[in-house]
């Protein structure tokens, strides 16, 4: 249920960097802000401590205190790298054959196979255990896959060029709304008038919510 209420900011990591540049921003803290301060027209969702802990610690150096939160954290890791790889393949930055053979052998040669391998590994190694975890072999393969993605996708000049466009777009949006707050939706204009939040925070709230519907 928690994963349904927080969404990634537009353009993923590039969007997060842009929002952090114009105003200190971290998506896990923003996710908690959404469920506490923005949803239900500012009333929040009145979630339990356990759910809020899972949201805040789903992708930080901290660790969720509940098994449910640990499931969210590890699921985020699995989905993140597989979605990025799938996007890179569909975008022509990578092909399946570019993935090192040892990683294809360990994890699978398609997005579906990799996800199945990772999910089954987590289930098998977490059964009757006090923590949610992967096997050491699969965790090593995941680290190697992440290193491969950094070298070939995240730092790829073609991908970086598109990210730079996204960063510039978000920075322009921020500057525009900072100068023209009258065009913000009603809930954000009311927040400007009635809350103690800084104007920059409220503009970040609006831009960070620009996901699929925009």
What are these regions (language model features)?
Residues 7-8, 79:
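Short active-site segment of divalent metal-dependent hydrolases/proteases
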């Amino acid at each position: 249920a928690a994963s349904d209420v927080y969404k990634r900011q537009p353009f993923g990591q590039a969007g997060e960097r842009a929002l952090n540049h114009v105003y200190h921003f971290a998506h896990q803290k923003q996710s908690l802000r959404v469920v506490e301060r923005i949803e239900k027209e500012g009333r929040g969702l009145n979630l339990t401590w356990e759910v809020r802990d899972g949201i805040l610690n789903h992708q930080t150096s901290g660790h969720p205190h509940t098994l449910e939160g640990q499931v969210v954290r590890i699921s985020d890791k699995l989905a993140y790298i597989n979605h990025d790889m799938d996007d890179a393949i569909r975008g022509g930055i990578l092909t399946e054959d570019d993935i090192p053979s040892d990683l294809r052998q360990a994890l699978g040669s398609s997005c579906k196979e990799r996800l199945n391998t990772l999910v089954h590994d987590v289930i098998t190694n977490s059964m009757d255990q006090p923590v949610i975890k992967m096997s050491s072999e699969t965790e090593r393969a995941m680290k190697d896959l992440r290193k491969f993605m950094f070298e070939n996708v995240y730092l790829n000049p073609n991908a970086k060029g598109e990210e730079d466009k996204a960063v510039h777009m978000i920075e322009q949006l921020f500057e525009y709304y900072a100068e023209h707050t009258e065009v913000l939706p009603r809930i954000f204009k009311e927040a400007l008038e009635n809350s103690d939040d800084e104007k920059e925070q409220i503009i970040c709230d609006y831009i960070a919510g620009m996901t699929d519907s925009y």
